A protein has these predicted regions:
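Conserved phosphate/anionic-ligand binding catalytic regions in large, soluble enzymes, centered on
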Residues: 42-62, 156-159, 242, 246-258, ...
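An N-terminal, well-structured beta->alpha segment
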Residues: 6-116, 207-237, 250
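N-terminal small/polar loop signature for handling phosphorylated ligands or for N-terminal nucleophile
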Residues: 94-163, 258-322
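Gly/Ser/Thr-enriched, mixed-charge loops and adjacent short helices
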Residues: 17, 37-46, 164-302
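Glycine-rich phosphate-binding loop plus the immediately following alpha-helix
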Residues: 169-199, 333-360, 364-378, 428, ...
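Phosphate-binding and adjacent anionic-ligand microenvironments
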Residues: 303, 307-309, 313, 323-324, ...
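Intrinsically disordered, low-complexity linker/propeptide segments enriched in Ser/Thr/Gly/Pro
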Residues: 569-586
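Short glycine-rich phosphate-binding loop at a beta-alpha junction
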Residues: 87-98, 241-244, 360-366
Length: 586
């Protein structure tokens, strides 16, 4: 109606301060009378959550652009002032960025990072702004290493090329968790009008508050990760050939440097994908989890060079995919099993006193394989699970470190790995080098990664997983589907399914409502959240199935796992006759 159009035009007038290219896009929409598109751009503001922001680059309050970056940073800055007072001006923040860009709107990660830095500087806050593209894990590393109040990483990770994001780290070096997300969100809403100096990125050329941490952090990071290098002699002499792709992202130079730090033979780089390119021209989606479509060029290079392992980072290099002998897929849970086993074996070699094992911890998210739990039970260290997302593992790791515990490893099935505690987030750069050393060590014993995985399952029990997702853009459909699971056959009261695929359901945990039938008081131990959907079913055959919504994509994800006793070789029978009856596959 007329009121809505007037409101939209009011937002449009506010936009005239913005980037000229963004303004031109909006003017074109106004001249064309494209009310629906204007409503999509200006109708609802992006929600700031624990994952920060992630949306398409373009005009309007629902998109990533100069103005929304300024508004977000103003709110974040005000919240930091509230939390740290004058300490913020003494300690400062770090800002990093990836290589994303959107020429039609004039937006890019570098420009957004510069604007964020300008906002902080306008309030007298020292800013450590990386002078060039950097992997996401370098930002939390910088927060911890430099003792800063916070960090910002401008990246959309593995999202489609038109997207960008704004990821936030707290002073403890981990991603933010509640209540910080709500506090920042409220502060953003209270500081929407741009401050006079917020647009002035010319200050970056002369402000004494601006520092470039690039060289220092680069040097310290590679020095620090060498504590995970335990077989330098084998690395130097190994003839193993490894292919690496950065999928048009930032990872190439950093992974090459990591291999060099470990004295590993440099991995063969996929030439067509090694340089940063915001168009991601060789892939439909820049997500190495998608498998063959993203790794076709890697497999071809491996075949040409006789390489036995393929490693792939996502565009911001915080995640890692591994393929053994070209096309044998080692899924996220399996690489988690291999890296967890490897990190523990290396720790044992340097810590022969078995009494210290009681202070060792490993973590994984609740939807990831429980293989670490099986290893922990046999070896005597501690295993804990957290809610989905590395923000929870990073914060729990910090709590344990503050109690003088040792966190050796954490992982999530979505190809995220934290080896050690120098970076309290997933880190695909260090994980690539550690995977390279593990590959070289095993090759010296004429063993492949796949063979070692089998050996792990033989010793600790087979853990067979199948995870996937359904695309759904309609929130009402998603809500109705989960409501049906909560009122199965009974609309009047809560009633979950009692069986699936002929297998009895023995327990239900609903982290949306906080219900857990396994607990004496029926209350879940893990934190619950009514704003996200997540239900886990346990089955009489030892299977577990979880359904949840994604926090960053229009997906309903499912995760299924079956565990067998150590030495049980009938994994394929188990897999096909029982696992496939889990709800995600029906």
């Amino acid at each position: 109606g007329g009121t809505t159009n007037t409101r939209l035009l009011g937002f449009y007038a506010f936009w005239l301060l913005s980037n000229p290219q963004t303004v031109a896009l909006v003017q074109g929409l106004v001249e064309d009378g494209a009310v629906e598109e204007l409503r999509r751009c200006f109708g609802s503001r992006m929600e700031f959550g624990t994952a920060g922001l992630r949306a398409a680059m373009g005009p309007g309050i629902s998109c990533m652009n100069d103005l929304t970056i300024i508004q977000t940073t103003q709110g974040f800055c005000k919240y930091l002032e509230h939390c740290f007072g004058e300490g913020l001006k003494e300690r400062g923040v770090v800002v990093g960025f990836d290589a994303r860009a959107h020429p039609p709107s004039g937006g890019s990660s570098k420009r957004f990072a510069s604007l964020a830095a300008a906002v902080f500087i306008s309030r007298g806050v020292p800013v450590h702004l990386f002078c060039d593209i950097t992997p996401t894990p370098f930002v939390p590393f910088a927060v911890s290493h430099l003792g800063l109040c916070a960090g910002v990483m401008v990246t959309a990770s593995h999202n489609p090329k038109q997207d960008n994001g704004y990821k936030v780290y707290w002073e403890n070096g981990a991603q933010i968790v509640p209540p910080h997300d709500k506090g920042i969100s409220v502060a953003i809403e209270a500081n929407l009008e741009p401050w006079p100096e917020s647009w002035d990125i010319t200050c970056l050329s002369h402000s004494p508050l601006l520092k470039d941490p690039y060289q220092n952090i680069h040097t310290e990071y590679y020095r620090t990760i060498q504590q995970h290098c335990h077989h330098r002699d084998i690395n130097k002499s190994s003839e193993v050939k490894i292919v690496h792709t950065s999928v048009h992202g930032v990872g190439h130079a950093f992974v090459q440097s990591a291999f060099k730090a470990f004295d590993l033979r440099p991995p063969y780089a996929v030439e067509e994908q090694k340089d940063p390119d915001p168009e991601f021209p060789t892939v439909k989606y820049p997500n190495p989890e998608e498998g063959k479509g993203v790794l076709t060029l890697s497999f071809a290079l491996a075949e040409r060079e006789g390489a036995t392992v393929v490693l792939a980072n996502d565009p911001d290099a915080d995640r890692l995919v591994c393929r053994d002998h070209w096309s044998v897929g080692i899924i996220g849970n399996e690489l988690g099993a291999l890296l967890g086993w490897w990190v523990y074996q290396c720790w044992i070699q340097t810590n022969p006193d078995q009494s210290t094992v009681k202070s060792v911890y490993m973590l994984s998210s609740t939807v990831s394989s429980k293989i670490l739990r099986a290893i922990a039970l046999k070896e005597g260290f501690h295993f804990e699970e957290t809610l989905t997302g590395f923000k929870w593992m990073g914060n729990r790791a910090r709590e344990l470190l503050d109690q003088n515990k040792m966190v050796l490893f954490a992982f999530e099935e979505a190809i995220g790995y934290m080896c050690g505690s120098a970076v309290l987030d997933k880190d695909g750069v260090s994980a690539a080098a550690i995977a390279g050393e593990m590959t070289s060590y095993l090759a010296a014993k004429n063993t492949t990664l796949s063979q070692q995985l089998t050996a792990i399952y033989e010793e600790y029990g087979y853990h067979i997983t199948k995870n996937s997702y359904f695309i759904c853009h309609d929130q009402e459909v998603i809500r109705a589907m989960f409501d049906r699971l909560r009122h199965y056959g009974n609309q009047e009261e809560v009633s979950y399914p009692r069986q699936c695929g002929g297998v009895a359901i023995t327990a239900v945990r609903d982290l949306t409502t906080g219900y857990d039938s396994n607990q004496a008081d029926n209350k879940a131990v893990l934190p619950s959240s009514p704003s996200s959907q997540m239900i886990t079913f346990s089955f009489s055959n030892g299977g577990v199935a979880t359904m949840r919504t994604s926090g960053t994509e229009p997906k309903i994800k499912y995760y299924t796992e079956l565990c067998a006793a150590p030495g049980n070789r009938y994994k394929h029978t188990i897999y096909y006759t029982e696992l496939c009856a889990a709800p995600g596959n029906r």
